Every structure is written in structure tokens, then in C-alpha cells.
From Swiss-Prot:
<keyword id="KW-0256">Endoplasmic reticulum</keyword>
<dbReference type="InterPro" id="IPR025110">
    <property type="entry name" value="AMP-bd_C"/>
</dbReference>
<dbReference type="InterPro" id="IPR020845">
    <property type="entry name" value="AMP-binding_CS"/>
</dbReference>
<dbReference type="GO" id="GO:0000038">
    <property type="term" value="P:very long-chain fatty acid metabolic process"/>
</dbReference>
<dbReference type="GO" id="GO:0015911">
    <property type="term" value="P:long-chain fatty acid import across plasma membrane"/>
</dbReference>
<comment type="function">
    <text>Mediates the import of long-chain fatty acids (LCFA) by facilitating their transport across cell membranes. Also catalyzes the ATP-dependent formation of fatty acyl-CoA using LCFA and very-long-chain fatty acids (VLCFA) as substrates. Mainly functions as a bile acyl-CoA synthetase catalyzing the activation of bile acids via formation of bile acid CoA thioesters which is necessary for their subsequent conjugation with glycine or taurine. In particular, catalyzes the activation of the primary bile acid, chenodeoxycholic acid.</text>
</comment>
<feature type="binding site">
    <location>
        <begin position="292"/>
        <end position="303"/>
    </location>
    <ligand>
        <name>AMP</name>
    </ligand>
</feature>
<dbReference type="GO" id="GO:0046951">
    <property type="term" value="P:ketone body biosynthetic process"/>
</dbReference>
<dbReference type="GO" id="GO:0009925">
    <property type="term" value="C:basal plasma membrane"/>
</dbReference>
<dbReference type="GO" id="GO:0005324">
    <property type="term" value="F:long-chain fatty acid transmembrane transporter activity"/>
</dbReference>
<keyword id="KW-0472">Membrane</keyword>
<dbReference type="GO" id="GO:0031957">
    <property type="term" value="F:very long-chain fatty acid-CoA ligase activity"/>
</dbReference>
<keyword id="KW-0436">Ligase</keyword>
<feature type="transmembrane region" description="Helical">
    <location>
        <begin position="31"/>
        <end position="51"/>
    </location>
</feature>
<dbReference type="InterPro" id="IPR042099">
    <property type="entry name" value="ANL_N_sf"/>
</dbReference>
<protein>
    <recommendedName>
        <fullName>Long-chain fatty acid transport protein 5</fullName>
        <ecNumber>6.2.1.7</ecNumber>
        <ecNumber>6.2.1.3</ecNumber>
        <ecNumber>6.2.1.-</ecNumber>
    </recommendedName>
</protein>
<dbReference type="GO" id="GO:0006699">
    <property type="term" value="P:bile acid biosynthetic process"/>
</dbReference>
Length: 690
């Protein structure tokens, strides 16, 4: 019988005693003797009690209570279960989670349901003059709640007039937005205006171009694309195909240098700022798509993950759940095309009524100066952000700031400790989750290095499993009955989260094949259904989760998910490469994995490092660019004609192990140069910058 089963049986026995009118103090005394005094002291006291029974027999309770005390001693483990250390916080968190869930359901059950854009209108009435958004940088500006709501209303009326009502309804198509971070406030005004009309919005990575950009727009089902004028070249590369599919394109500016593309600026300025009636979005349900955020998933090009209005409100309430208030100032250096930057950051501040400070890009040298300038109290991060801050040489004013809380994901334990030692006792709440996932984890006790915490209470609300997996196929291992095999405590396992009515998995827009690939059936019993996160975690005895690795083709580098198939598609365009296999490799001292490609040269061709460098710099964002190239005579495949990546990833880029020619990305020389032992040593020691 397990510890928790014993404790449950003991609790039922004690409840029976209460029902029979018997005292519980003997059982409580037994518990105190065993757990708080230890076994030696416990048995000494019991021996003394036995010797002194003639003197204490007059107040010995009924034999049932004595039996309960004996049962308590026999069932109790020698020490309290580790989980009980955090029992008070587990109970408080579970009640808080239940309260927020019931409140969310109440809001969504209204007719029409209360949507995330309603928070803007509420803040515009309650706190009209409070600053909602601040954009830092050379073109720094700010906007109040009243002004932001007025601009959103102008955008709604302008787009309604431009596009006609049939074009902007939820069941007819989305609107895609492609903007640089410097245009954040303008883009957010348009985004909120579209939300007032009930139109879902797809946020596209502004680094996308060519085929990935075209695929992103098409897969979202967008009938409209709004583009930053500074991304003119990106748009014009794919414009003919967009126009051929009747996708209307607009520049978020006052002029258009491109035939076939209109400018929105004048229409936005001329539109009225009258309130937008809620009836225009009356057809929206809480399960309706609100936002599409692109994710690499485990395979293929970026896919638009569906964030319903329910999910957006859940995520945007995280700051409130963490105890933040309208008096907080949140510093956000994360991109708006990520759920952390847009939903938890911007929309989270709108829900709170707090001020969100948007930095166009992360700068370790300016980070704390801007935090001081804007009196920031909360910072959002991915693990790399805090590591970069710790890598900057120490300054006397490192602890002179008003930041008291940090929220994010991907923070290593060593960086966590270093960050708090250097910059002060900043409370850190680490999160775990994926954009398309149906369940998230939260380290609500601030335990260093953990990505989340669970308990028996949380498991009832959010069932999940850690199961054994095949590292080659990246699939769960099954037992003889066909069910998944749970891992032991402390062992790494593939995280699966149960799909239920109140925790649905909406998947991706478009083909259902991509969505079905993320589903795992018959995990614990016949007929159940789980979401495969593709992540490997470990669970310790106290209920803390620790991130171990990512499965499948996707790896994480510099805070971004990198799809190997997307990179393979870009590299395969080169005429001197016949076959390409991209994978992630570990680099000492670095978080995540950096890209590496094993390639087979086309017959009669030679490797051209300069041409490859120019190609990847033109077609791939920096985080997706492979840093190492390995030339092989042939690429190994499985029986099902899939490229073998695991062995290559294990071998990495070690020049002492690999006999094949190896090359490394050299940004100074703008080429891929031969990887020599001295350069390999520099990479391992951290003196060669990746």
C-alpha cells in the first residue's frame, strides 16, 4: 500500500472515531511522537507509558482510541511525505485556481460573453488617464487607456468601411498582422480594433519571408494582411501569390510604394472614435478563435495555433493570479508574435489596468536603465533574457531598481540563483506551457530550478502524466495491454496532458493532420485522450517539475522554437546540396540547442561556405541559422524513410570524434569556415560567440 493510500485509510479511520464519539488525541499524540520526535524518542516515551500504566490507567480513553493510536503508528511512514512540506501553499493555490476558474466561467457564460477586448473598454472608463502602453527606444511614446480605446475604435470603423462587414466576420477569415516591434502601439491599436469587430488576428513573425511568410498567411485563412511599411521587401516577394488568392494587403502607414497595396494611415486618422457596439461581435462564442500564434510544433513549417477567447482570458489573467495589481508597471521585451509577449504581457496588463512598457528589442546594456526610468515593478522573461543580464559586467547600481517580481519560462537553476544574488530578492514565478497546449504548470512557491508544482489537489483539476518514451521515434512506450507506462519519481518522462471538456485542445487551424499528430489515445484506459507536449520533464518527491529536453524535430535556441524541417527546406534550395538533415546540438554553457546540418553534396559540386552564409542570412532569422555543417557521403534513414537525427545529435560537433568534414559559421568572415581543434576548444570554453 502506497503512502497516500495509507494516509487516506488512516483519515477514514479517524473520521469513523469521530462518528463514534471517541477522542482523537491519542492518534494525534502518536503522529507527533512519530513525525516530530522521531522513532527513538517515540519508543522511549511509549516504554515509559507502559511502565507507568498503573498511574495513568484512570484517564486512558476507550480501547477504540488506543486502537486508533496503534493504527496511526503502524500506518505512518517514518517521516512525513515530502509533499506535506508545501501543503498550505498547495491548498491555497488549489482554492485560488478554483476561484479563478469559476469566475472565468461566469464571465464567459454571459450573453454575449465577456471578451478580452472588453477589458480595454472597462479600463478606459475606470482609469481613463492611466498610461496603458509605453514604447521605449528612439521613437518613444506612450498612450493612455482612453487614447488607446479611441484609437482601437477608429481602427474598427476604418477597417469596417474598407473591408465591408462580410470580409471581417469570424467565419469568413482572419486578418494577419506583420509589423516590426517599433510599430507596436499602432499595431496593437489595429489589433484591438479588429477584436471589437469580432475578427481573429494572426500575428506573424516579422523575420519571416519567402515561402515561410506565404505559408503563414495562407495557413491562417486570412483575407487581409496588414504590413509594416519597413517590411516592403518581405511583402513584395510574395505579393503576386497573395493577390492571386484575393488576399487584400495594406500598409500600416500613410503612403504605399507598392502597386496593389493600399495605405491605411489616412483612413485610420479620419475614422470616428465612437464606441463600437458589442452587437458587432455578438456572434462570437467563448470557443471562437481570437488569436493565431505561430508555433513550429514538432514538424513542418510554422502552424497557426488556435487561441480561443476562453484561452486568451485564462492566459491574460496570469498576472492577476500572481498577485499583481493596477499599480504595477510591467517591462516587456518579448515579441508580440509570441503568446508570452502579447497575451500574458500586453493583454494581461489590460486586464489588470497596469502599465505595459514595450521595448522594441532586448538590450542587456539598457535593460536596467529603462527599468529605473519607468519605475518598473514586474519583468517578463525567457530564460535567455536573465542569463544575458547576468553576463553583463557587474555595476554598483545593480540592486538600485524597483523590480520586485519576474514571470516567465526557461530559467536554469544556476541563472536563477545568480540573478537573485546580483540584482536583489526579486520574486520569480516560473511557468511551463505551450501556445497550443491545454494545460500549464506554475512554480508558485518559487522553488529554484523547477518549472512547475503539482499536488493531489492540482492533479484532480488538471490531470497529466509523465510516461516512458522511445528516443528514436519520440513516441510513448506501451505495455502489453497497450497503455502508456508511467515513469518513476525523479525519472524523465514525456509529458501528456489529459483533454477534457473544460480543458480542450484546439490544435492548429487548417488541416487536421497536424492537430491529430499531437494526440495520444488510450494512455491510462481505453478511450481517454491526451495532448502530447513533446517535452521531457521529471517530477520529484515534493511535486516539483523540472524541464529536461524537447522531443521531435523542434529544438529551442535563443528563446525561439526552431523547426528543422523549415530550415531543411531553405537549405535544400542551394544547388550544391542534395540532401539536408538539420538537428540541434548541445553547446557547453549555453541554454537550449544550436542548429547543425548534416548534408550530402550534389554530384560534381563542392561546398561553398560564402554562398551558404549569404543564403541563410537572407532566408532565415538568426536564431534558426545552423552554426555547424557536417558533410557526409550519405544520410542515414530509418525503415520508414525518415532521417535519423538522434545519433547525429549525440555526436554533436566534436572534431575528436567525427571524421567527416566540419564547418562553423563565422560572422566576421561572412562564411562557413573549417572547424579546427582550436576553434572547437574556443566554442566549448565560451570564447567563440554563437
Amino acid at each position: 500500500m502506497g503512502v497516500w493510500k495509507k494516509l487516506t485509510f488512516l483519515l477514514l479511520s479517524l473520521l469513523l472515531l469521530v462518528g463514534l464519539g471517541q477522542p482523537l488525541w491519542p492518534a494525534a499524540t502518536a503522529l507527533a511522537l512519530r513525525w516530530f520526535l522521531g522513532d527513538p524518542t517515540c519508543f522511549v516515551l511509549l516504554g515509559l507509558a507502559f511502565l507507568g500504566r498503573p498511574w495513568i490507567s484512570s484517564w486512558i480513553p476507550h480501547w477504540l482510541s488506543l486502537a486508533a493510536a496503534a493504527l496511526t503508528l503502524s500506518l505512518l511512514p517514518p517521516r512525513p511525505p515530502p509533499e506535506l512540506r508545501w501543503l498550505h501553499k498547495d491548498v491555497a493555490f488549489a482554492f485560488k485556481l478554483l476561484f479563478y476558474g469559476l469566475n472565468l466561467r461566469r464571465r464567459l457564460n454571459r450573453h454575449p460573453p465577456e471578451l478580452f477586448v472588453d477589458a480595454l473598454e472597462q479600463q478606459a472608463q475606470a482609469r481613463p488617464d492611466q498610461v496603458a502602453l509605453v514604447c521605449t527606444g528612439s521613437e518613444g511614446c506612450s498612450i493612455t487607456n482612453r487614447e488607446l480605446n479611441a484609437k482601437a475604435c477608429q481602427a474598427a470603423w476604418a477597417l469596417k468601411a474598407k473591408l465591408k462587414e462580410a470580409t471581417i466576420q469570424e467565419d469568413k477569415g482572419a486578418t494577419a498582422i506583420l509589423v516590426l516591434p517599433s510599430k507596436s502601439i499602432s499595431a496593437l491599436s489595429v489589433f484591438l480594433g479588429l477584436a471589437k469587430l469580432g475578427c481573429p488576428v494572426a500575428w506573424i513573425n516579422p523575420h519571416s519571408r519567402g515561402m515561410p511568410l506565404l505559408h503563414s498567411v495562407q495557413s491562417s485563412g486570412a483575407s487581409v494582411l496588414i504590413v509594416d511599411p519597413d517590411l516592403q521587401e518581405n511583402l513584395e516577394e510574395v505579393l503576386p501569390k497573395l493577390l492571386a488568392e484575393n488576399i487584400r494587403c495594406f500598409y500600416l502607414g500613410h503612403s504605399s510604394p507598392t502597386p496593389g497595396v493600399e495605405a491605411l494611415g489616412a483612413a485610420l486618422d479620419a475614422a470616428p472614435s465612437d464606441p463600437v457596439p458589442a452587437k458587432l461581435r455578438a456572434n462570437i462564442k467563448w470557443k471562437s478563435p481570437a488569436i493565431f500564434i505561430y508555433t513550429s510544433g514538432t514538424t513542418g513549417l510554422p502552424k497557426p495555433a488556435i487561441l480561443s477567447h476562453e484561452r486568451v482570458i485564462q492566459m491574460s489573467n496570469v498576472l492577476s493570479f500572481c498577485g499583481r495589481t493596477a499599480d504595477d508597471v510591467v517591462y516587456n521585451v518579448l515579441p508580440l508574435y509570441h503568446s508570452m509577449g502579447l497575451v500574458l504581457g500586453v493583454l494581461g496588463c489590460l486586464q489588470l489596468g497596469a502599465t505595459c512598457v514595450l521595448a522594441p528589442k532586448f538590450s542587456a546594456s539598457r535593460y536596467w536603465a529603462e527599468c529605473r526610468q519607468y519605475s518598473v515593478t514586474v519583468v517578463l522573461y525567457v530564460g535567455e533574457v536573465l542569463r544575458y543580464l547576468c553576463n553583463v559586467p557587474g555595476q554598483p547600481e545593480d540592486k538600485k531598481h524597483t523590480v520586485r517580481f519576474a514571470l516567465g519560462n526557461g530559467l536554469r537553476a544556476d541563472v536563477w540563483e545568480n540573478f537573485q544574488q546580483r540584482f536583489g530578492p526579486i520574486q520569480i514565478w516560473e511557468l511551463y506551457g505551450s501556445t497550443e497546449g491545454n494545460v500549464g504548470l506554475m512554480n508558485y512557491v518559487g522553488h529554484c530550478g523547477a518549472v512547475g508544482k503539482t499536488s493531489c489537489f492540482i492533479r484532480m483539476l488538471t490531470p497529466l502524466e509523465l510516461v516512458q518514451f522511445d528516443i528514436e521515434t519520440a513516441e510513448p512506450v506501451r505495455d502489453k495491454q497497450g497503455f502508456c507506462i508511467p515513469v518513476e519519481t525523479g525519472k524523465p518522462g514525456l509529458l501528456l496532458t489529459k483533454i477534457r471538456k473544460n480543458q480542450p485542445f484546439l490544435g492548429y487551424r487548417g488541416s487536421q493532420d497536424e492537430t491529430k499528430r499531437k494526440l495520444v489515445a488510450n494512455v491510462r484506459q481505453v478511450g481517454d485522450l491526451y495532448y502530447n507536449t513533446g517535452d521531457v520533464l521529471a517530477l520529484d518527491q515534493e511535486g516539483f517539475f523540472y524541464f529536461r529536453d524537447r522531443l521531435g524535430d523542434t529544438f529551442r535556441w535563443k528563446g525561439e522554437n526552431v523547426s528543422t524541417r523549415e530550415v531543411e527546406g531553405v537549405l535544400s534550395i542551394l544547388d550544391f546540396l542534395e540532401e539536408v538533415n538539420v538537428y540541434g546540438v548541445t553547446v557547453p554553457g549555453c541554454e537550449g540547442k544550436v542548429g547543425m546540418a548534416a548534408v550530402k553534396l550534389a554530384p560534381g559540386k563542392t561546398f561553398d561556405g560564402q554562398k551558404l552564409y549569404q543564403h541563410v542570412r537572407s532566408w532565415l532569422p538568426a536564431y534558426a541559422t545552423p552554426h555547424f555543417i557536417r558533410i557526409q557521403d550519405s544520410l542515414e534513414i530509418t525503415n520508414t524513410y525518415k532521417l535519423v537525427k538522434s545519433q547525429l545529435a549525440r555526436e554533436g560537433f566534436d572534431v575528436g570524434v567525427i571524421a567527416d568534414p566540419l564547418y562553423i559559421l563565422d560572422n566576421k568572415a561572412e562564411t562557413f569556415r573549417s572547424l579546427m581543434p582550436d576553434v572547437y576548444q574556443a566554442v566549448c570554453e565560451g570564447t567563440w560567440k554563437l
